[in-house]
């Protein structure tokens, strides 16, 4: 693995790490955030498809990738809602941990990964450590009933959202879709859900299609799409491969968490900062272990 490949592998870290921070900085309601994000992703996906001359996949693959993108958008809407109550710095480590656990369990029970007893022991130990890490990142010194209720509600919502993120990964695998071929259909699926959600949220005092934040968030969509695109490149066997590419991309949670604390000014006590950093370390290290178990 050379320096160029590692640099490519770290590009998703920058894109996915900065994406939630930009969304938080621009602001807006979840409908505006998902509209802008999906519009930005679709624009870049069209540019990439034209530039590469990527052929449109056959009907079944196109539909599965479209559903994949729709699943992501549904999950992301939930995540945007949780940002409002828990903040980026608490939400991102939790959703990253859930995605790592979800991907691992999908691999074990559906794809037949971790076939040996030793692999299962190591893998499920790693999952337990991820769960502990998630708990630490969500921990707060505020013991009020309102704070506890908000945290529990946020975590439960993110668990539901994990089904969408799992669908985002699983549907392309079901048809063995090439990453670049699936990129545009996924972006179309994301945008369809974004538009439908925007229409359902349109009211007399709030019209997401006329909100400035909806179009400012196109910029955040470019960062998400950049990360998704560079991840496709990184995951190719000739670059970093799927396992290494996945682990490198998940380091984006460091950017997002630190950005939430220092750029979005999400306050943490000294004890909470220690808990967050230890939790992040557990999520990243244990997540790396799950990616390399055979």
Swiss-Prot record:
GO molecular function, one term: carbohydrate transmembrane transporter activity
Keyword Transport among UniProt keywords: yes
Transport in keyword set: yes
A Pfam family this chain is assigned to: Sugar_transport
UniProt keyword terms in alphabetical order: Cell membrane, Membrane, Sugar transport, Transmembrane, Transmembrane helix, Transport
Residues passing through the membrane, by range: 2-24, 34-56, 63-82, 92-114, 121-140, 150-172, 179-198, 218-235, 242-264, 274-293
Topology versus the membrane: Multi-pass membrane protein
Domain of life of the organism encoding this protein: Bacteria
Function, as annotated: Could be involved in the uptake of ribose.
Name of the protein in its database record: Putative ribose uptake protein RbsU
């Amino acid at each position: 693995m050379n320096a160029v490949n590692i640099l490519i592998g770290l590009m998703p870290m920058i894109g996915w790490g900065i994406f939630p921070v930009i969304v938080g900085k621009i602001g807006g309601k979840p409908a505006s955030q998902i509209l802008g994000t999906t519009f930005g992703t679709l624009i870049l996906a069209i540019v990439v498809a034209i530039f590469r001359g990527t052929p449109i996949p056959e009907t079944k693959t196109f539909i599965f990738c479209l559903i994949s993108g729709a699943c992501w958008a549904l999950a992301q809407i939930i995540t945007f809602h949780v940002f409002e109550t828990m903040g980026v710095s608490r939400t991102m480590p939790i959703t990253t941990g859930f995605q790592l656990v979800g991907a691992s369990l999908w691999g074990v029970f559906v794809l037949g990964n971790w076939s040996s007893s030793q692999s299962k022991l190591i893998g499920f130990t790693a999952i337990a450590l991820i769960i502990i890490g998630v708990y630490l990142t969500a921990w707060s010194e505020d013991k009020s009933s309102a704070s506890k209720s908000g945290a529990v509600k946020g975590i439960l919502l993110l668990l539901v959202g994990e089904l969408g993120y799992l669908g985002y990964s699983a549907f392309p695998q079901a048809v063995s879709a090439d990453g670049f071929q699936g990129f545009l259909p996924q972006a179309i699926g994301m945008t369809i859900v974004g538009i439908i959600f925007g229409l359902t949220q349109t009211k007399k005092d709030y019209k997401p299609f006329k909100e400035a934040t909806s179009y400012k968030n196109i910029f955040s969509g470019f960062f998400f799409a950049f990360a998704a695109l560079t991840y496709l490149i990184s995951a190719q066997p000739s670059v970093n491969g799927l396992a290494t590419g996945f682990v490198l991309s998940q380091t984006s949670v460091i950017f997002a968490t630190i950005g939430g604390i220092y750029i979005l000014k999400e306050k943490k006590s000294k004890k909470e900062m220690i808990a967050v950093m230890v939790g992040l370390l557990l999520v990243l290290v244990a997540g790396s272990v799950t990616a390399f178990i055979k």
